[in-house]
């Protein structure tokens, strides 16, 4: 988005009454769907929403449906996919704008895909991007505080997610171990699936239960049993067991047998930028997208498992005045789990990067503050010894950094790591 367009949108939001803004978004959603001839009527669209795990869950669902013999498309914050063709999502948007998304679904329908798996964001829901899309199923990964300032509180954030479930009345897939389970279970659905590990969901919820037993996880992978089938994933962490269960529940709602789910999930080696091990030698280096306190804590917990040496982290926080509340929380988590902490810039937008760094580092007593992200990564790698583990969070597989005045520069945490280690060896 150009600086001029961004300015005009900001002014419009301030001068237009709230109902007019909502009406504008609704009409734009209708116009986009009509222009593209309502493509979702020709395909089955699976919507995946939640705070964390949407991209991984969407890719897991796509892998299972493909394994089952269907032609599948994906719209995620990582990539777009139609059958075997894949291209990177460079928009920095979890859920594309109305016309982009409807045009994508039109292509999906025209290329005879049976399914489209779409990430659904709270911002997208607030702007009616989900409207006039006929969703076969709505799946919830989890819900933790995020986008609090833009929504005006957690209850409003949860309510935004709820609008998606209210709009999709066919199949609902809900994380039964999430504290918000019963809120989402209250929305009417033809069929409801509840998944979990801890079996904490209430029997009052009328739903088919997809549960995991004998769940074990580490940085090297995870395993569990469900419906009498043993699953062994190469993806790390307990959070990926939850992501897998969500994907299994969606697949089972479409009649896919458990064995096909197992074969597909066990074939997934890595998800780009999601606890991705980019180097393994004397020490290990992980790159992860974690941008919320919940996802950051889970990443650190997983990274500490089986660790002989020290855990060294590089982290930042997004600028633009967004979710400032979480900056000290993330600094505290880094201090709690990591032996050495490097706080740096992430995507400052128009905000002073040094102020963002200060708000994080003030909660981490021994944090080293380095504004230049490349230098911070180099310093962390230089500090790593035999048996240590370095985890770099916040960017994942993103290929640009957002600076002031709408400027973007090419970026890759992974490439910076590999370039440095290649030169230092």
Where are these regions (language model features)?
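Acidic, Mg2+-coordinating active-site environments of NTP-dependent enzymes
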Residues: 41-43, 109-111, 135-285, 308, ...
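Phosphate-binding loop of NTP-binding sites
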Residues: 7-176, 182-191, 245, 251, ...
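ATP-dependent carboxylate-amine ligase
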Residues: 1-9, 15-22, 246-273, 277-425
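Short loop/edge segments at beta-strand edges and connector loops
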Residues: 76, 120, 176, 196, ...
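Short, small-residue-rich loop/turn micro-motifs
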Residues: 76-79, 228, 269, 394-396
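Short, active-site-adjacent cap segments at secondary-structure transitions
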Residues: 80-82, 124-126, 179-183, 201, ...
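Cofactor-binding loop segments of dinucleotide-utilizing enzymes, especially the Rossmann-like FAD-
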Residues: 51, 77, 175, 197, ...
């Amino acid at each position: 988005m150009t600086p001029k367009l961004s300015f005009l949108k900001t002014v419009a939001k301030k001068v237009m009454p709230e109902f007019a803004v909502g009406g504008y978004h609704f009409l734009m959603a209708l116009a986009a769907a009509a222009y593209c001839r309502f493509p979702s009527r020709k395909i089955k669209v699976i919507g995946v929403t939640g705070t964390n795990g949407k991209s991984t869950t969407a890719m897991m669902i796509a892998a299972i449906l493909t394994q089952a013999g269907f032609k599948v498309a994906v719209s995620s914050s990582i990539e777009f996919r139609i059958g075997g063709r894949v291209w990177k999502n460079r928009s920095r948007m979890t859920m594309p704008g109305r016309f982009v998304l409807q045009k994508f679904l039109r292509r999906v329908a025209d290329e005879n895909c049976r399914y489209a798996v779409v990430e659904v964001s709270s911002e997208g829901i607030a702007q009616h991007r989900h409207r006039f899309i006929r969703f076969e199923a709505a799946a919830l990964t989890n819900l933790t505080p995020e986008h609090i300032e833009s929504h005006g509180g957690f209850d409003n954030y949860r309510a935004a997610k709820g609008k998606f479930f209210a709009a999709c009345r066919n199949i609902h897939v809900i994380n039964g171990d999430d504290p918000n389970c019963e809120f989402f279970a209250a929305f009417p659905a033809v069929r409801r699936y509840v998944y979990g590990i801890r079996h904490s969901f209430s029997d009052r919820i009328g739903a088919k239960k997809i549960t995991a037993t004998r769940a074990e996880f580490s940085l090297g992978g995870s395993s569990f049993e469900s419906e009498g089938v043993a699953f062994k994933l190469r993806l790390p962490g307990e959070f990926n067991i939850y992501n897998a269960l969500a994907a299994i529940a969606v697949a089972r709602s479409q009649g896919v047998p458990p064995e096909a789910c197992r074969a597909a999930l066990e074939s997934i080696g890595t998800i780009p930028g999601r606890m991705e091990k980019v180097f393994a030698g004397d020490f290990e280096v992980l790159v992860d997208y974690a941008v919320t306190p919940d996802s950051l804590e889970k990443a650190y917990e997983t990274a500490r498992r089986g660790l002989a040496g020290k855990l060294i982290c590089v982290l930042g926080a997004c600028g633009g005045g967004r979710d400032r509340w979480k900056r000290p929380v993330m600094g505290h988590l880094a201090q709690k789990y990591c032996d050495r902490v490097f706080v740096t810039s992430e995507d400052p937008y128009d905000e002073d990067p040094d102020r963002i760094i200060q708000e994080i580092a003030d909660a981490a007593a021994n944090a080293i503050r380095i504004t230049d992200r490349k230098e911070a990564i180099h310093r962390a790698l230089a500090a790593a010894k035999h048996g240590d583990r370095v985890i770099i969070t916040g960017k994942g597989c993103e290929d640009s950094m957002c600076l002031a005045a709408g400027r973007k520069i090419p970026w890759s945490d992974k490439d910076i790591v590999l370039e440095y280690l290649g030169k230092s060896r």
